Design a protein with these regions (language model features):
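Terminal, non-globular segments
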Residues: 2-187
Length: 187
């Protein structure tokens, strides 16, 4: 077994872990809070996108079309997550973040249509994924700040989950920022 076989095998861990999370979340779905239900929906959406992207990539040779879809689904899930967590208490903040969400969604829709018209590596840009990931990190940081400044107690599990969200999406951001330069180094 060489390095290629090992890395190819490791790519199958993602749907396996997502499937496990969906099954586990489904077993406890009626007993969990709305925030954790959103996470289960998120895992299900990511599993559907993962499987669809693999099948589409095998059939058409490129699954770049799914990058903006992935970014939109992540942004939608975590916007809902933080909406229900209570960080949008003020009307100003709700309007501001709602406007950013709508503008980002419009950009992702535009990027989706431009990629679907020309899904080649040479013209690929991962801006929608970078934008959605950056906004999720900002929402998570805003969650920390608003909970620290408020006098309300926060459940330790929610605090831990928010920390994991920040760490995961910060790593994704670090990975996706240079992708444009790696793919399009001649531009």
């Amino acid at each position: 077994m060489d390095f290629y076989d090992i890395t190819n095998f490791l790519t199958y861990l993602s749907p396996i872990i997502l499937f496990g999370g969906v099954v586990l979340g489904s077993c406890y779905f009626s007993k969990i809070d709305i925030l954790y239900k959103i996470i289960v929906y998120y895992l299900f959406g990511m599993l559907a996108i993962d499987i669809s992207a693999r099948v589409y990539g095998e059939i058409y040779g490129s699954n770049l079309l799914f990058i903006p879809i992935l970014g939109f689904m992540e942004l939608l899930a975590f916007f809902c997550f933080y909406f229900y967590s209570g960080i949008l208490e003020s009307r100003k903040k709700s309007v501001f973040l709602g406007t950013i969400f709508l503008l980002s969604s419009a950009f992702m829709a535009w990027e989706f249509t431009s990629i679907s018209n020309n899904a080649t590596l040479e013209g690929f840009q991962s801006y929608s994924k970078v934008i959605s990931t950056f906004l999720i990190v900002m929402l998570a940081i805003d969650f920390f700040i608003s909970k620290i400044l408020s006098s309300k107690n926060i459940a330790p599990q929610l605090f831990f989950l928010n920390s994991v969200i920040i760490m995961y999406f910060s790593m994704v951001l670090i990975i996706f920022i240079p992708i444009d330069f790696l793919i399009n180094d001649a531009t």
